[in-house]
Regions:
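Acidic carboxylate-rich catalytic motifs and surrounding loops in phosphoryl-/glycosyl-chemistry enzymes
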Residues: 46-51, 177-181
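Alpha-helical cap/lid subdomain in secreted, periplasmic
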Residues: 40, 64-213
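Active-site micro-motifs of SAM-dependent methyltransferase domains
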Residues: 13-14, 51, 92, 182
């Protein structure tokens, strides 16, 4: 039976292109690349929203970016699921949202608990969970982005270690996005086409393992 994978994330999953201030071509977005590598053995659902946080309100946003509040509805929409990939935390680095890697880690833990405790319809089994640390924020000459993430370079560099420890504690899979991808200096937080493709390719082995493919 075809496996179903939900990619729950922010603009990195949506496919924001800092170079064009638009969206990467469908085939370049990491969930699309992951789909291509898995072929007909799995169906990969991209659920990305620009600005989404793990579990915090962004009162400057024009839509609900709180990942914890939206997640139960998304889970219900796409059930049954075999794997949920969580790639969030970069937007939590904004001081107006949370401002620390510790807060982002707490938020990821909240999402894991929501998935584990979800009232799945029709007695569906719950999915496996893969926590992915987003590639760390890098230096940029883009003044608005730099001003939005003061301290973000240092804090985001802590995410991989915190997420790895959390995954071990909660029995989730873990993948470090920094192992295959780097953020673009155009704005310091997003991925260019080459790096978003690299993320999709890099995730294939652990996703196959967790799906039993």
């Amino acid at each position: 039976m075809t496996k179903t994978v939900l990619c729950y994330g922010d603009s990195l999953t949506w496919g924001y292109d800092a170079d064009t201030i638009g969206r990467h071509a469908y085939e370049n977005r990491w969930p699309s690349v992951l789909q291509a590598t898995l072929g007909s053995e799995a169906r990969v659902i991209a659920e990305g929203l620009n600005g989404r946080t793990t579990a915090f309100d962004d009162h400057l946003a024009d839509c609900d970016r709180n990942g914890a509040r939206i997640l139960p509805t998304v889970l219900q929409t796409h059930a049954p699921l075999d794997l949920v990939i969580l790639l969030l935390g970069t937007n939590d680095m904004k001081p107006v949202v949370a401002g620390s890697a510790f807060a982002a880690c707490q938020g990821i833990g909240r999402l894991v608990r929501l998935i584990r405790n979800h009232a799945w319809p029709f007695e569906f089994d719950g999915p496996e969970i893969l926590i992915v640390a987003p590639p760390a924020i890098c230096a940029t000459g883009n003044a608005p982005f730099a001003a939005s993430f003061p301290g973000g370079i240092e804090e985001s560099a802590k995410l991989a270690t915190l997420y790895r420890d959390l995954a071990d504690e909660l029995g989730c899979g873990f993948f470090d996005g920094n192992s295959v991808a780097r953020t673009t200096p155009i704005d310091g937080i997003h991925l260019d086409a080459e790096n978003t493709r690299a993320l999709g390719r890099g995730l294939e082995p652990i996703v196959r393992m967790m799906l039993g493919l």
